[in-house]
């Protein structure tokens, strides 16, 4: 993932991770486009290069980008239910006006409230960028 801070052009490729969630402030819509990709190291370089796809998105003031590992969306509660992508998107919408640090803390709080005391066995990692 590369963000040109002069033009606010975001470029990303998938190499085994989840597609970023982008909240567009002016339209209040979520953009999350799956693109072709494969985890790094699974195939040789020529095959990897032929599979990988790059996506460019023009961001504007107030737009929010959230990347995350599947440990967030696959977090399980005591009923063996996953928190899920829709819940993550709703949490982003709910906390979208927060500064980035609080946004991440509040999403984490939503996930932990859902799972309760159930041990999790996957990492839960997030990164958020808000365009000024």
Regions found by a protein language model. Give the residues of each.
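Conserved subregion of the PPM/PP2C metallophosphatase catalytic domain
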Residues: 1-132
């Amino acid at each position: 993932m590369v963000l040109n801070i002069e033009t606010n052009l975001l470029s990303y490729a998938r190499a085994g991770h989840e597609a970023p969630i982008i909240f567009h402030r002016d339209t209040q819509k979520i953009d999350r486009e799956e693109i072709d990709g494969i985890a790094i190291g699974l195939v040789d370089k020529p095959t990897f290069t032929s599979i990988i796809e790059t996506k460019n998105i023009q961001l504007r003031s107030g737009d929010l980008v959230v990347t995350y590992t599947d440990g967030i969306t696959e977090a399980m509660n005591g009923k063996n239910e996953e928190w899920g992508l829709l819940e993550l998107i709703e949490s982003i919408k709910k906390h979208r006006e927060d500064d980035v640090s609080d946004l991440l803390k509040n999403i984490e709080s939503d996930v932990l409230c859902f799972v309760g005391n159930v041990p999790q066995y996957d990492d839960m990692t997030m990164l958020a960028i808000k365009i000024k």
